[in-house]
């Protein structure tokens, strides 16, 4: 996803309030854990993009930020919402630097749910864990990890270790945890 961002000067409440009134989202771009720049993202463009995303996919979406004539690859590290309107009011981006490890949550997508043996026998498929914490290089980031549930029967479970994790991605979460189960109704 490509976003054009503008620089902003200050962190004063009055300035940030004015940015939001003009249709912007105040944001901070971090690099190596340190603040690199205060920026503004167009609220309409970002909200439209959010509405097209699958649940949980924002954490592993790589953004290309056009900032002061250069292209910066970044991940959303934190997002804050308004309490009542649920509008995005602040973003934190983390710059992706080639060769430097990045920690992120990657969503788990169950595939072949319609053909699941346990569901055909009247069971209910329950996804216990929806994402897995991993460490990888920016070039190895994947939008999601797939877990095939086709052969899962009634009262059976699949663990995180059953996910086919691509080379270059190291899970931080314990792989012994149950990811999906088929329960009797």
Swiss-Prot record:
<dbReference type="InterPro" id="IPR020056">
    <property type="entry name" value="Rbsml_bL25/Gln-tRNA_synth_N"/>
</dbReference>
<protein>
    <recommendedName>
        <fullName>Large ribosomal subunit protein bL25</fullName>
    </recommendedName>
</protein>
<dbReference type="GO" id="GO:0003735">
    <property type="term" value="F:structural constituent of ribosome"/>
</dbReference>
<dbReference type="InterPro" id="IPR011035">
    <property type="entry name" value="Ribosomal_bL25/Gln-tRNA_synth"/>
</dbReference>
<comment type="function">
    <text>This is one of the proteins that binds to the 5S RNA in the ribosome where it forms part of the central protuberance.</text>
</comment>
<dbReference type="InterPro" id="IPR020057">
    <property type="entry name" value="Ribosomal_bL25_b-dom"/>
</dbReference>
<dbReference type="InterPro" id="IPR020930">
    <property type="entry name" value="Ribosomal_uL5_bac-type"/>
</dbReference>
<comment type="similarity">
    <text>Belongs to the bacterial ribosomal protein bL25 family. CTC subfamily.</text>
</comment>
<dbReference type="GO" id="GO:0006412">
    <property type="term" value="P:translation"/>
</dbReference>
<dbReference type="InterPro" id="IPR001021">
    <property type="entry name" value="Ribosomal_bL25_long"/>
</dbReference>
<dbReference type="Pfam" id="PF01386">
    <property type="entry name" value="Ribosomal_L25p"/>
</dbReference>
<dbReference type="InterPro" id="IPR037121">
    <property type="entry name" value="Ribosomal_bL25_C"/>
</dbReference>
<keyword id="KW-0689">Ribosomal protein</keyword>
<dbReference type="Pfam" id="PF14693">
    <property type="entry name" value="Ribosomal_TL5_C"/>
</dbReference>
<comment type="subunit">
    <text>Part of the 50S ribosomal subunit; part of the 5S rRNA/L5/L18/L25 subcomplex. Contacts the 5S rRNA. Binds to the 5S rRNA independently of L5 and L18.</text>
</comment>
<keyword id="KW-0699">rRNA-binding</keyword>
<dbReference type="InterPro" id="IPR029751">
    <property type="entry name" value="Ribosomal_L25_dom"/>
</dbReference>
<keyword id="KW-0687">Ribonucleoprotein</keyword>
<keyword id="KW-0694">RNA-binding</keyword>
<dbReference type="GO" id="GO:0022625">
    <property type="term" value="C:cytosolic large ribosomal subunit"/>
</dbReference>
<dbReference type="GO" id="GO:0008097">
    <property type="term" value="F:5S rRNA binding"/>
</dbReference>
């Amino acid at each position: 996803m490509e976003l054009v961002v503008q620089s902003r000067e200050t962190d004063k409440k009055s300035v940030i309030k004015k940015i939001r009134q003009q249709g912007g989202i105040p944001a901070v771009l971090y690099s190596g854990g340190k603040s690199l720049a205060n920026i503004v993202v167009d609220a309409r463009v970002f909200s439209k993009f959010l509405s097209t995303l699958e649940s949980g996919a924002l954490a592993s979406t790589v953004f290309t930020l056009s900032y002061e004539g250069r292209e910066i690859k970044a991940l959303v590290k934190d997002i804050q919402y308004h309490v009542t309107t649920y509008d995005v009011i602040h973003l934190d981006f983390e710059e992706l630097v080639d060769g430097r490890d990045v920690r992120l949550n990657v969503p788990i997508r169950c595939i072949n749910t319609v053909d699941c043996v346990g569901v055909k026998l009247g069971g209910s498929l329950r996804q216990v864990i929806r994402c897995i914490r991993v460490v990888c290089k920016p070039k190895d980031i994947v939008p999601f990890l797939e877990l095939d549930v086709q052969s899962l029967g009634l009262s059976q479970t699949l663990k995180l270790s059953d996910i086919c994790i691509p080379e270059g991605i190291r899970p931080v979460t314990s792989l012994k945890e149950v990811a999906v189960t088929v329960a009797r109704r």
